């Protein structure tokens, strides 16, 4: 029972709490408002440590950590941190930070532990202000953000979106340069006057606009791979449960981690495949460590210190300086395959641990990610991190301050590289093999007696390209903090969107009962006509779109569901300038300030693949299962708040092969749908 509930928790974390019920929004009191403003201010213009008019500046400059040792839960954490700092051993302020480097991982964990161990909010704030002035900005941003998520006294508090903190990770260097030019040519009057807020728009394109000579078909998907909110979503999903954090120490249910790692990437890869279909690209190419990599990586995004991200040409072989990792990666792959086929992992004491148990998937996920909860990191290594290092093609530097990480070594840029999808297709193949070796579902597990789908009708499905603006103030340097608040620089880009639609479902029931409706979207292939055979072959290519509880009455039941109600998704994150204005008005007493326990989900506007102008066929799969309210459980996870979940596993019933049965399943329903893309030349400026 526990494992089933946990699987749902993992899905909830991925997509916004599938089938979960949330507490409502809250109205902030004055204590919450002042804390929220302090947190937000610390991440504005985070690369500048010279903003002497900011509140945190004097706080951080005057704070003496050694004199306040009693204000931390664990003095050893403070002593260790200060020793490292005094020895000058931390990453330099202008170096490039990546949590996937072993030295930098150790350092960001020390900074996080320092912030987390502060006994009260004031000590936490003073410590953060001190670190804001002295530590590497990327390391500070990561450690501080995670501390805010996990500290009880900062629960539900928001920070600027990562694309607003580091716009250079999301927009090409030409955009950053134009923003800086605008600031130099027009921003000075804003800073000195500070009477009016002035907004400037910088138009931007996707990578394919600047690289047609490379003719790489993978970049037909640049509007998806480089989507700002999608990349931010992935960043937060990985940062929410850092691989270096021990779940037993930080109120992070241990049984979540492995499933979350798997389900996050399963959902993303399925959604990516559906987008490939809209562009006639077929399945993602497989790769071999000993052969050239098909896809290149071409981008002009750059790090904050002006260094461009390492590139990779099409069909390029592994560089010689990565050869030393080949034996290691091949050994790790062999050990993973042996574990799946034999049915057991080997822990650090040499004991065999059965993985074909309710806890097995979680253990396998931890091992592949190489998280702190892996049962044997020494033997199974950190496959995910090592594979990213090899595929990134970046140079190996002995000095951490000279390191230039690849796009794959930053969670906020990983999805821009086509190799990301090749890598995770390979990783998911291990999980798929594991799933295929599990027993098929029985009739009693699948059927819902007395319940039958009568019909399903759906509005016509349309996608289009809209204009999206992103605040990029952090791309420029400002003379002072207050003046920076009166300048609004925004990058405008075409972004895919969809027209909201309604599901109209008719179900017949012979009794009053409660159930859970699951809706999936998958590809439509013509070679297989029988639905059961189709699911047997392509079950793993379906993405779960929605999930909600229903109460059925005897007889015919009509159910209407809006696409925007999906708990998997969230609408566009409120821009920082609007959020900050609302926050200040609330502090001034002119209007109330409300906040939600749920702050993140998959971008709603990307819930549908693009389709085609003439329409493209996909398949929707509807499944209704019984729900026992006595088997529900509640959990609370950073960014997602409190969730109440049922007892079915993630992706049920498409989490494993669906064999052709000798019985009927009236509580499932297939429907062909067509997705139409409305061309918009004005918005599609790429």
Curated annotation (Swiss-Prot):
SUPFAM superfamilies: Di-copper centre-containing domain, E set domains, Hemocyanin, N-terminal domain. Induction: In 5th instar larvae induced by juvenile hormone. May be post-transcriptionally repressed by miRNA. Residues 32-155 form the Hemocyanin N-terminal domain. Residues 440-676 form the Hemocyanin C-terminal domain. It comes from the Eukaryota. Residues 1-19 form the signal peptide. Glycans are attached at residues 205, 662. Residues 161-431 form the Hemocyanin middle domain. The keyword Protease does not apply. It is found in: Secreted; Nucleus; Cytoplasm; Cytoplasmic granule. Keywords: Cytoplasm, Glycoprotein, Nucleus, Secreted, Signal, Storage protein. InterPro entries: Di-copper_centre_dom_sf, Hemocyanin/hexamerin, Hemocyanin/hexamerin_mid_dom, Hemocyanin_C, Hemocyanin_C_sf, Hemocyanin_N, Hemocyanin_N_sf, Ig_E-set. Expressed in the fat body and secreted into the hemolymph (at protein level). Present in trophocytes and oenocytes of the fat body (at protein level). Not expressed in ovary or testis. GO terms for molecular function: nutrient reservoir activity. The keyword Transcription regulation does not apply. GO terms for cellular component: cytoplasm; extracellular region; nucleus. Its main location: secreted. Storage protein that may function as a nutrient supply to compensate for lack of dietary proteins during metamorphosis and egg production. Belongs to the hemocyanin/hexamerin family. Hexamerins are evolutionarily related to hemocyanins but do not bind copper and have lost the ability to bind oxygen. Probable homohexamer. This is Hexamerin 70c.
